[in-house]
Swiss-Prot record:
GO terms for molecular function: DNA binding; tyrosine-based site-specific recombinase activity. It holds the Pfam family Phage_int_SAM_1. Residues 1-73 form the Core-binding (CB) domain. The keyword Zinc-finger does not apply. The gene is xerD. GO terms for cellular component: cytoplasm; Holliday junction resolvase complex. This is Tyrosine recombinase XerD-like. Its main location: cytoplasm. Disruption phenotype: Cells display severe growth defects. Putative tyrosine recombinase. Not involved in the cutting and rejoining of the recombining DNA molecules on dif(SL) site. The active site is at K150, R211, Y243. It is found in: Cytoplasm. InterPro entries: CB, DNA_brk_join_enz, Integrase-like_cat_sf, Integrase_catalytic, Integrase_recombinase_N, Integrase_SAM-like_N, Tyrosine_recombinase_XerD-like. One of its GO terms (biological process) is chromosome segregation.
Length: 244
């Protein structure tokens, strides 16, 4: 089973050397505890061992292990899609949401539409409804800006450099996400997003949580709350105060 760690990491082409080392350490420790035969019982024992760690460390290890477990399930190495959960008592101790390790979102996916939706929310803080309404005419790749129109209001947001290559192939369309030159429905968007986050080992992530991750990353980068509110199209910073 230990050799599957290398195979798992080989599929994560977008990870840095340090990130791969972190994954390798966590997964080797995981296999040391659960042994060669993964079962509900061995996973419960492993979860119990994590209880004394900091919440951030627990979340990191659980995230890495869940991605690895999903990889094993996809490859037919295990007969069920096992999944670790953060202990309820640990969840209650968490006063503020924490930044999740989502580097895997930049890697290739069998759900490219869901991947792009996730990246637009995570990197720009956009709502699914805003994304579905985006027309290619609203995008200027040269100046790295996007015009968001909502009701009678408009705002201009900066497109991160990393997203330019993701958007460029779609510039010949009418809408960013379309079928027959018409935008997809919200239900379609949520299905695509759901399939993508499940593929990456984060089945509980929603558009709301990804938008929250955008906010947390902005705050970590010392961006002013008023500037964050402007990027999100919020009229006040009241809903952002809890993230201080």
């Amino acid at each position: 089973m230990r050799d599957r760690i290398s195979a798992f990491l080989e599929e994560k082409q977008g990870l840095s050397v340090n990130s791969k080392q972190s994954y390798k350490y966590d997964l080797e420790q995981f296999l040391d505890m659960v042994g060669e035969r993964i079962s509900e019982t061995s996973l419960k024992i492993y979860q119990a061992q994590l209880a004394n760690l900091k919440i951030s460390a627990q979340k990191r290890k659980i995230s890495a292990c869940n991605q690895f477990l999903y990889f094993l399930y996809q490859k037919g190495e295990v007969d069920s899609f096992y999944r670790l959960e953060l202990a309820k008592q640990a969840e209650k101790k968490t006063e503020k949401p924490e930044i999740l390790y989502l580097d895997s979102f930049w890697q290739e996916s069998d759900h490219p539409e869901g991947r792009l939706l996730a990246l637009l929310i995570l990197e720009m803080g956009l709502l699914p409804s805003e994304i579905l309404a985006i027309k290619v005419a609203d995008i200027n790749l040269d100046f790295q800006v996007l015009r968001i129109s909502k009701a009678s209001q408009q705002r201009i947001v900066t497109i991160p450099t990393a997203l330019l290559s993701e958007l460029e192939p779609l510039m010949g369309q009418t809408y960013l996400f379309e079928r027959g030159e018409k935008p997809y429905s919200r239900q379609w968007a949520f299905r695509q997003l759901e399939s993508f986050v499940k593929e990456k080992g984060f089945p509980s992530l929603s558009a709301q949580v990804l938008r929250e991750q955008f906010i947390l990353r902005q705050i970590e980068n010392k961006v002013d709350l008023y500037e964050i509110a402007k990027k999100l199209g919020l009229k006040t910073v009241l809903t952002l105060e809890k993230y201080r």
